[in-house]
């Protein structure tokens, strides 16, 4: 019988070791708090709970790709001063999945695919990558990374807020981003946001099908 497929979720902080010891310690505390919040919010989708490993890397194991998009953008929204590389791998496990397990305790093809995708993303200066999925999923991730790389810091912040809170009204987005509502509208026009939404919708459809 075929082994069930899982999705290993790896989120690595860019250039974390360049921070001062004090700043890095504060970052690690924030990451631990974020992992706890993800465990609460995505409990129904977790095969193994999110935890911090390798100092500044967050790992989680999902039962399907369904929460990946939301989880990735929750990270970016909650820690806007942090640059993330997020990589996901689809596949089975080779270690036993026991009750209460944390993601870093486990191993298997899904983790190997995620690690290879993460390494490739870092080498190519990408921020989103996938392994073990249909090739078009990683193709969309490349489009995503290229678009993200061309935006200003303010545009990235707005994109992360809108992707993490797709139903938020203009005033709520303005609060999350820290600008006036009129600035939100201006940034959307500059980003041609309606086309970004179209691309994002297609990306999410191929990711979860």
Residue ranges: model-predicted function:
Residues 1-209:
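Regulatory and interdomain segments flanking nucleotide-handling catalytic cores
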């Amino acid at each position: 019988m075929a082994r069930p497929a899982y999705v290993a979720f790896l989120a690595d902080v860019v250039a974390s070791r360049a921070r001062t010891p004090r700043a890095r310690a504060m970052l690690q505390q924030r990451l631990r708090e974020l992992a706890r919040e993800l465990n609460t919010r995505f409990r129904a989708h977790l095969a193994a709970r999110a935890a911090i490993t390798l100092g500044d890397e967050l790992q989680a194991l999902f039962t399907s790709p369904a929460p990946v998009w939301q989880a990735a953008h929750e990270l970016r929204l909650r820690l806007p001063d942090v640059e993330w590389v997020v990589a996901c791998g689809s596949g089975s496990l080779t270690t036993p999945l026991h009750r209460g397990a944390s993601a870093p305790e486990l191993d298997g093809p899904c983790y190997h695919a995620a690690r290879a995708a993460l390494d490739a993303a870092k080498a190519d200066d990408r921020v989103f990558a996938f392994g073990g999925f249909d090739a078009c999923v990683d193709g969309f991730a490349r489009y995503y990374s290229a678009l993200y790389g061309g935006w200003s810091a303010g545009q990235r912040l707005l994109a992360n807020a809108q992707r993490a809170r797709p139903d938020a009204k203009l005033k709520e987005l303005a609060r999350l981003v820290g600008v006036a509502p009129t600035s939100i509208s201006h940034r959307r026009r500059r980003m041609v946001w309606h086309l970004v939404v179209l691309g994002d919708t297609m990306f999410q459809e191929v990711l979860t099908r």
